[in-house]
Amino acid sequence: MSEPRKILVTSALPYANGPVHLGHMLEYIQTDMWVRFQKHRGNQCIYVCADDAHGSAIMLRAEKEGITPEQLIDNVKAEHSADFADFLVDFDNFHSTHSDENRELSSMIYTRLRDAGHIATRSVTQYFDPEKKMFLADRFIKGTCPKCAAVDQYGDNCEKCGATYAPTDLKDPKSAISGATPVLKDSKHFFFDLPAFDTMLKSWTRSGTLQDAVANKIAEWLDSGLQQWDISRDAPYFGFEIPDEPGKYFYVWLDAPIGYMASFKNLCARRPDLDFDAYWGKDATTELYHFIGKDIVNFHALFWPAMLEGADLRKPTGVNVHGYLTVNGQKMSKSRGTFIKARTYLDHLPPEYLRYYYASKLGRGVDDLDLNLEDFVQKVNSDLIGKVVNIASRCAGFIHKGNAGVMVDANAAPELTDAFLAAAPSIADAYEARDFARAMRETMALADRANAYIAEKAPWALAKQEGKQDEVQAVCALGVNLFRQLVIFLKPVLPNLAADAEKFLNVAPLTWDDHKTLLTHHQLNPFSALMTRIDPLKVEAMAAASKEDLTATDTSTDAAPAGNGELAKDPLSAEIDFDAFAAVDLRVALILKAEHVEGADKLLRLTLDIGDEQRNVFSGIKSAYPDPSKLEGRLTMMIANLKPRKMRFGISEGMVMAAGPGGEEIYLLSPDSGAKPGQRIK
């Protein structure tokens, strides 16, 4: 028998400024099912998580509520913990990034990086709120759009016309926090030298640690050239102060992933059987897996492994990425009642129904998952009640009535039990590969065969015939054994059903290997209903409650990333209709020339080839591309039908597209290889 595997598993850390919703729960349920499967198989699998408890957003919300940030994160942690527990997400430890362990580990990792020469400093110019005495992120600046003159727009994009721009381009800028007019101010920032790890990352990301689609996306970023990563923020800021640098704090995304380590270290203090270095030391032979949403891939597949490498620590065995959640084919919506908080769901429906539905649709890829509420009702009622539970309810009564609840020693259909036994390795492989949808399909196919057998034998009809009692008992004993097999296969997804079934079956907690045996001459306990059908009215009530509580209290946007990434900190803009989008002409452009603009602090002049003509475009990306010549020869994406804009330095004939919060973190977008200048993007 092989030695049990030693596995450490994490989910992305939920941000500690509000409740979790069903989009978040997709990730935690997915991770929990995989962890439960590993434990079911006899492996030592540890599952840790924590609240992501730092950042300006938390500091400002606490101030708005008249409490300290510590009080806010304690309150939110209690809410998160209750929601996770009630959704049967069984963490071995749920901690907080605002902890002594995380402070110690963050300082240690930073110090190692600094001493190894991987930290640089330079001056950065940003808007500063003179009343609040704080530097302002782009989303904390509002003013008049420089393109369409719409008022009350954010510092990086216009919600009315969709334009993106640098905060310094905004007209009449105001602090969104105090209303004061911000001023430009220089500050020393600290940068992690990510480009120094380019070779390692190119190898590591192609070593099987990522899904192919994710590795391909990472390759695009690597091929475009990595930039140094700004890891500091200025006081006032809620977080950890950088060692030996008063008034300078770690950016939340530096200490957030270190929170995985901190939560595990906190657990190690209570579990003498666990050795921290055995899981995080450079030469660790244990397994380490991160489950995340696709919105935070860059942090986990670029910054995080590079930090670990530079700090002489182990890198993850795998980073498992999933897509977003949609509801009824659309993004979650307050107005439609489909922006559903975890607690709102739990107030109306049992957690295992959603766990099963997610499992039935979760493959191993990064595609988005749609929660169709009508399909949800139909699938749960059909599969769980109509197929799985139905087997036990059909058979148990005959065993109790005809044989005092004792299962006879008979296998009425060996070919059927052999089929169940033969299916187990494939189902296990599906679980291991995180292809839960395949595991559920194959399990339900077995349930169909079991139900077909019972329907064919019709014990309810046999019981009425003279001399058929032995056959009735044999058929029903087999039915209960097949039900037991199904429960074993479903236990990682449906732990409560498994526990209730174990009571009915009068057995110890089932393990995966129990599928190899049958119960014979075994006493059952009385059967009671294990699950009830979903009443569609309860789903309607849940949607109605979601409209009410989210309209009244929630400040989130309609977007529903299933993790805790950039959307949580930089919400989506307001919806536009299709006609508004269709009016934007997006084209592939080849950068022929890129150069500094004399007298401009943030602009580069780009000469673009869009097929049959050339365009001159000024772009505020200088801070991220100090050597513009490296952009020459690269394909990018541009808005080609934007009205030319006369600037002090010339006329700008369009706009190139980039992502990132601004400053040093600007990432020019590129199409996939094979695209040609002038091709329409659609």
From Swiss-Prot:
This is Methionine--tRNA ligase. The lineage of its organism: Bacteria, Pseudomonadati, Pseudomonadota, Gammaproteobacteria, Pseudomonadales. Keywords: Aminoacyl-tRNA synthetase, ATP-binding, Cytoplasm, Ligase, Metal-binding, Nucleotide-binding, Protein biosynthesis, RNA-binding, tRNA-binding, Zinc. It comes from Pseudomonas syringae pv. tomato (strain ATCC BAA-871 / DC3000). ATP binds at K334. GO terms for cellular component: cytosol. Homodimer. GO terms for biological process: methionyl-tRNA aminoacylation. A motif ('HIGH' region) lies at residues 14-24. InterPro entries: aa-tRNA-synth_I_CS, Anticodon_Met, Met-tRNA-synth_bsu_C, Met-tRNA_ligase_1, Met-tRNA_synth, Methionyl/Leucyl_tRNA_Synth, MetRS_core, MetRS_Zn. Is required not only for elongation of protein synthesis but also for the initiation of all mRNA translation through initiator tRNA(fMet) aminoacylation. One of its GO terms (molecular function) is methionine-tRNA ligase activity. It comes from the Bacteria. Residues 580-682 form the tRNA-binding domain.
